[in-house]
Regions:
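Basic- and aromatic-enriched surface patches that contact anionic nucleotides/nucleic acids
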Residues: 1-25, 31, 138-214
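Short alpha-helix boundary/capping and kink motifs at helix termini
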Residues: 2-144, 156
Length: 214
C-alpha cells in the first residue's frame, strides 16, 4: 500500500455511514434464508440498543497507541480501530508466546506507506512488540502488520534470519478492538459471510450467530 492510498483511505473512511452499512447487510441477509432473517433480526436489535448513538469515526486517545485498519465495502471504507497498548497488556496477562518467522515470510505484511526509509528521521519506539493480524474476513487471509513495520522492514533489509512476531488469526484479535463499533462490524461481516454463502465458519452452533457474542 503506497502512502497516498493510506491518506485516501483515512479521508474516505470519515464519510462512511455505519448505520447505512448495517441496514444494507441485514436486508441482504433477510432476503437470503430463514437463518438470515433470524441473524438480521439480532443485528437490528443490537443496532437499536447499543450502536445507534456510537460516534464514528472513533476518537483516538492521546498518549495511547492505536492502529487504524481500513476495510473496503460496497458502502465505503470503514476504519477498524485497534488498541495496540491493550493488545500488549493482553499478551502479558495471557502469557501468549511469539512465533519465530524469517523476515522474508512476512515482509508482505508491511505497509510501504508506513515506512520511513530515512534512518535519521526514524523515532524508535519498541514499547510494544511486533504484531500481525491474519483475517479471512478483514484482509482475505493476507497478513497485515499492526505494530512493528519498521522492525520487520529492517530485519528484512539486513538479511536477518529470524524475528519474533505475535501472530493473531480470526477471533483471536477481537479483544484488541478499541470501540464497540469496530467489534460489531467485524462480527457483522462474519455473520454476513456465513448467511450469504450458507456456511457456519467459526461457529460451533449451526443455529448460532456472532451477533450472540456481541
Amino acid at each position: 500500500m503506497i502512502k497516498n492510498q493510506i491518506e485516501y483511505y483515512e479521508e474516505a473512511s470519515r464519510c462512511f455511514n455505519p448505520l447505512k452499512h448495517f441496514q444494507m447487510r441485514t436486508q441482504e441477509m433477510e432476503n437470503k434464508s430463514n437463518y438470515g432473517v433470524r441473524t438480521a433480526s439480532k443485528w437490528n436489535e443490537i443496532v437499536g440498543q447499543y450502536l445507534k448513538d456510537e460516534i464514528y469515526p472513533v476518537v483516538h486517545p492521546i498518549g495511547q497507541e492505536t492502529f487504524s485498519l481500513y476495510a473496503v465495502f460496497p458502502t465505503g471504507i470503514f476504519e477498524y480501530a485497534l488498541d495496540i497498548d491493550g493488545a500488549t497488556a493482553l499478551i502479558k496477562k495471557e502469557g501468549i508466546n511469539p512465533t519465530i518467522f524469517n523476515p522474508t515470510q512476512i515482509i508482505a505484511s508491511v505497509d510501504e506507506g508506513n515506512i520511513n526509509k530515512d534512518l535519521n528521521n526514524i523515532k524508535t519506539n519498541h514499547k510494544n512488540p511486533v504484531m500481525i493480524l491474519q483475517s479471512q474476513r478483514l484482509m482475505g487471509n493476507m497478513p497485515h502488520c499492526i505494530n512493528g513495520n519498521h522492525r520487520i522492514f529492517e530485519a528484512h533489509r539486513n538479511n536477518e534470519k529470524s524475528i519474533e512476531v505475535y501472530h493473531f488469526k480470526d477471533l483471536e484479535f477481537v479483544p484488541f478492538f478499541y470501540d464497540d463499533l469496530s467489534k460489531a462490524m467485524y462480527y457483522l461481516e462474519m455473520d454476513f459471510n456465513n448467511v450469504i454463502n450458507d456456511k457456519r465458519d467459526f461457529l460451533k452452533d449451526p443455529y448460532g450467530a456472532f451477533a450472540d457474542a456481541f
